[in-house]
Design a protein with these regions (language model features):
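Active-site helix of classical SDR
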Residues: 1
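NAD(P)-dependent short-chain dehydrogenase/reductase
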Residues: 7-54, 60-61, 67
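A general structural signal marking secondary-structure boundaries and capping sites
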Residues: 40-44, 70-74, 102, 137, ...
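Mid/C-terminal beta-alpha module of Rossmann-like enzyme folds, strongest
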Residues: 72-119, 159
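Conserved C-terminal active-site "lid" loop/helix of NAD(P)H-dependent oxidoreductases
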Residues: 90-92, 96, 112-151, 155, ...
Length: 159
């Protein structure tokens, strides 16, 4: 598990920086943003869960904070830190804005998690507290909708 990996690293006693993140997306690979762009372009209606809340993380912003830590020579600040973009949304909110920014007209409807049975138990609230990271490294974290706009613009340019 991720926790076991973190504990193993901590047990070595070496200097380390572990960054926990959530709801990660980018222009590359498979992720929620690209899936929603495709589904909202090909469906008239779509159900998305509204009872799971968190904060999306743009991979470009995660890379920027890692670069900031390295470039400002702060690698001695050992510990576990949380990083995601600023703000909070549900998967439903996230999907609606992805659809809108992508120029799609799909009718996205809210639903409960129980409507999509999964062997993996997902938390209903998974917002990460970034205060330690921001205070320790002096990094200004972008708001999730601003980063989403940037990602969708880059996806549009790549077409």
């Amino acid at each position: 598990t991720k926790l076991a990996g973190e504990k193993s690293i901590e047990a070595t006693g070496c200097k380390h920086i572990i960054i926990r993140t959530a709801w990660l997306y980018s222009q590359w690979g498979k992720n929620f943003v690209k899936t929603m762009q495709s589904l909202t372009a090909s469906h008239d209606t779509l159900k998305v869960v509204f009872d799971q809340v968190g904060t999306p993380t743009y991979a470009g912003d995660l890379a920027a904070v890692i670069s900031h830590i390295i470039e400002t020579n702060q690698l001695d600040k050992t510990g576990i830190y949380h990083f995601s973009n600023e703000g909070v949304c549900s998967w439903f909110d996230f999907a609606k804005i992805i659809c809108e920014l992508s120029g799609n007209t799909c009718d996205i409807q809210p639903c409960y998690s129980e409507e999509f049975p999964s062997p993996v138990k997902r938390p209903h609230f998974s917002v990460l507290d970034k205060s330690k990271l921001k205070q320790t490294f002096g990094f200004k974290v972008p708001y999730w909708t601003d980063s989403l706009k940037k990602c969708i613009a880059e996806l549009a340019e790549a077409k």
